[in-house]
Swiss-Prot record:
Recorded domain comment: Consists of an N-terminal hydrophilic region, a hydrophobic central region composed of 10 repeats, and a short hydrophilic C-terminus. The N-terminal hydrophilic region contains the importin beta binding domain (IBB domain), which is sufficient for binding importin beta and essential for nuclear protein import.
Name this protein carries in UniProt: Importin subunit alpha-6
Subunit structure: Forms a complex with importin subunit beta-1.
Organism: Rattus norvegicus (Rat)
Disulfide bonds: none
UniProt motif Nuclear localization signal: location: 45-54
Entry GO MF terms: nuclear import signal receptor activity; nuclear localization sequence binding
Gene name linked to the record: Kpna5
Length: 539
């Protein structure tokens, strides 16, 4: 079979032999919002690194302090040297450049020194934030520009209301102009500020994008030879690409792909991590967006980075690869052609549960593909490890492995399904029938149904009349569990359980008590209460 089948053939193939309970859209599962909110926390951590410069040595312990809500800081006594003084206010509004610089530095130190900088106190002083913004325009005084940019960066690292103050004072267009400053310190601080602003929420992100940040930002990334500037600029770019509710305007952010594809070959793990995060955001969408990412030529390098020795690179690279294989069979094949399966097999053995889970999710979208792609997973010796995961891993990882197995039983050829049975997939699928997660119970039922359907077909062809897989399910206590599911609160589950028993395990006609009655008013099956299977429910 041609692995590059046309979409039309693909749809026909899906409809003709795949389990009707799992349509192609369900089998290929887009990523749900899992809260990789990038990353107010990360921005706070970066600001901690910046604040370290002004921390006295005996205050190093503050680095271990938890990040608190800015409101908490109002209850903490502020040392006298950390107060906003009348002299500071007077100097910042003076016409003397030296006094302006001295006052701005004092404000910057206040906003940099503590884990809980007095942002509220600063923004409540009338005209102070506006004064910082005014100083951004002082091209003849780059030191004042830098100090003002630093102060505004730290204000924008706070809550949405703090960030909003910076936006409303008109700082964003000026920061964007400063990306082309001839002073690298000013450039770096400007891009850091813009990253903080864009990273707050979708509204702030879109405001920054609509101010036409991308051309000067990409120019900065192309021309800068300073590693810290590149790190901050890539991080800001990743924040511009981030978000799903709503996502950024793809036409505004997709021009960054050429620069990202070049930066994928950076030797710096921080740069690589944020490049991969940006690519994961851009590929998290419909197939037309996935195709644009593929066309930028990043796939082979993303797959190579799955084997990187730093998990902060591996995790976003895996996320991006996983998003790409949510596309159609042809898009999935691009990743397979980059030798992704040996890398995914390696990641199934990762000590990090989150990586194992993500690898299973990625494989589940590959096994939702065509039979040649399922065969590639078989040839890669991945299914034995998946079945072990299905038996032993944490539940969230077992769920993804269950999808991978069931997808293969839905789209696989008879010999491929028989292979899964010989590996022992029936017992762990039966074990999932007692979990509390209704969706996974349905996935397990679908997998077992696909196996039983094949057995029925084989028994008719062989003229034996006995479905060989019924006995295997009974031996795994699966029949007891399926019978119990006839009293499940979920209608689809109890209907499926009833159908499986009726079709494959038979109901004795002389035992009418086993046949569910129908409530004519509610049009629902009425089942007798079954005793729970001996093993009970699992969490």
């Amino acid at each position: 079979m041609d692995s590059m089948a046309s979409p039309g053939k693909d749809n026909y193939r899906m409809k003709s032999y795949k389990n009707k309970a799992l349509n192609p859209q369900e089998m290929r599962r887009r990523r749900e919002e899992e809260g990789i909110q990038l990353r107010k926390q990360k921005r706070e951590e970066q600001l901690f690194k910046r604040r370290n410069v002004s921390l006295p040595r005996n205050d190093d312990c503050m680095l271990e302090s938890p990040i608190q809500d800015p409101d908490v800081s109002s209850t903490v006594p502020i040392p006298e040297e950390d107060m906003i003084t009348a002299d500071m206010i007077q100097m910042i509004f003076s016409n003397n450049a030296e006094q302006q610089l001295t006052a701005t530095q004092k404000f910057r130190k206040l906003l940099s020194k503590e884990p809980n900088p007095p942002i509220d106190q600063v923004i409540q002083k009338p005209g102070v934030v506006q004064r910082f913004v005014k100083f951004l325009e002082r091209n003849e005084n780059c030191t004042l520009q830098f100090e003002a940019a630093w102060a505004l960066t730290n204000i924008a690292s706070g809550t949405f209301l703090h960030t909003k103050v910076v936006i409303e004072t008109g700082a964003v267009p000026i920061f964007i102009r400063l990306l082309t400053s001839e002073h690298e310190d000013v450039q770096e601080q400007a891009v850091w500020a813009l990253g903080n602003i864009a990273g707050d929420n979708a509204e702030c992100r879109d405001f920054v994008l609509n101010c036409e940040i991308l051309p000067p930002l990409l120019e900065l990334l192309t021309n800068s030879n300073r590693l810290t500037t590149t790190r901050n600029a890539v991080w800001a770019l990743s924040n511009l690409c981030r978000g799903k509710n709503p996502p950024p305007n793809f036409s505004k952010v997709s021009p960054c792909l050429n620069v990202l594809s070049r930066l994928l070959f950076s030797s710096d793990p921080d740069v690589l991590a944020d490049v991969c995060w940006a690519l994961s955001y851009l590929s998290d969408g419909p197939n037309d967006k996935i195709q644009v990412v593929i066309d930028s030529g990043v796939c082979r390098r993303l797959v190579e980075l799955l084997m990187h020795n730093d998990y902060k690179v591996v995790s976003p690279a895996l996320r991006a690869v996983g998003n790409i294989v949510t596309g159609d069979d042809i898009q999935t094949q691009v990743i397979l052609n980059c030798s992704a399966l040996p890398c995914l097999l390696h990641l199934l053995g990762s000590p990090k549960e989150s990586v194992r889970k993500e690898a299973c999710w990625t494989i589940s979208n590959i096994t939702a593909g065509n039979r040649m792609q399922i065969q590639a997973v078989i040839d890669g010796s991945i299914f034995p490890v998946l079945i072990e995961v299905l038996q032993k891993a944490e539940f969230r990882t077992r769920k993804e492995a269950a999808w991978a197995i069931t997808n293969a039983t839905s789209g696989g050829a008879p010999e491929q399904i028989r292979y899964l049975v010989t590996l022992g997939c029936i017992k762990p699928l039966c074990d999932l029938l007692t979990v509390m997660d209704s969706k996974i119970v349905q996935v397990a039922l679908n997998g077992l149904e696909n196996i039983l359907r094949l057995g029925e077909r084989e028994s008719k062809q062989n003229g034996v009349g006995i479905n060989p897989y019924c006995a295997l399910i009974e031996e795994a206590y699966g029949l007891d569990k399926i019978e119990f599911l006839q009293s499940h609160e979920n209608q689809e589950i109890y209907q499926k359980a009833f159908d499986l028993i009726e079709r494959y395990f038979g109901v004795e006609e002389d035992d009418p008590s086993l046949v569910p009655q129908v409530d004519e008013q509610q049009r629902q099956f009425l089942f007798q209460q079954c005793e729970a299977p001996g093993e009970g429910f699992q969490l």
